[in-house]
Amino acid sequence: MEPLERGWITDGNIEKFDEVAEAVRRAVKKCGTRTKNVAMALPPSAVITKKIVLPGGLSEQELEVQVESEANQYIPFSLDEVSLDFCVIGPSASSAGDVDVLIAASRKDKVQDRQGLAEAAGLNAVILDVESYASRLAADRLIQTLPNNGADAIVALFEIGAFTTSMQVIRNQEVLYDRDQAFGGAQLTQLIVRQYGFTPEEAETKKRGGDLPDDYGSGVLQPFVESTAQEISRAMQFFFTSTPYNRVDYAFLAGGSAALAGLTAAVTQQTSFPCSLIDPFAGMEIGGGVRENKLRREAPSYLTACGLAMRRFLQ
């Protein structure tokens, strides 16, 4: 894992290409991999997705023509300016003999930025996914370990990033609701800066290393944990008021700030729903050269990356 400074990537746009490319090179060097093919992801804000219904039995070429025709209705750009892809989900539940097809499109400049990052690090981008789709892929494997293989369970997945927390509510691999909220781990860093007078860089380093004054737990961390739990509870209330559902069976926390001491307990207390950290490596064999304690400690941060890596086994 290699941290990026604030402002290097904003709303999915790579603002400091050279700096981000150098960070990618450092990450590749650290992990020691000889693999050159990589899977990458765009944030949902950079991708337009739409589920459409098309006649069943079409060839791949016929599907492509139909998708391009339908896409013009939903994409506010010329098709020459976007990278477009689609996949057949399965038979349509609403129209006998037809199939549901998911189309996804992103501006070519955003796609080329990701490809350029890979090339700058000596890598070859073979898959470009959407972050939320990759997260769900990794989470779905874990949902299947729940009682009754997770069938009909309503699972709320929260990914707590630096500036944004993403919520997805999933049932039987279907997304019932999704929402982004503007809060994240960077707010904790800002609290540390204000409380102790550190620079933002010092605060981030000390936060990650646990090298903070004795009153940090009670004076800074605990209020932030309680505030985060309240935000998560508020997000659930939005779900309940926006859909016919009134319960969540399980809440999973992922992301860089998910493992903060006391957060899962605070969420359970705020919401009355069971909450736990997600470990995308659960049930996997860990290689001998991997520092397992460190991996387990940071595991919630790797949910999206794990989902991207799993694409290798789903081709």
Question: Model-predicted segments: where are they?
Answer:
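Hydrophobic/aromatic-enriched cytosolic interaction surfaces used to assemble or bind macromolecules
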Residues: 1-315
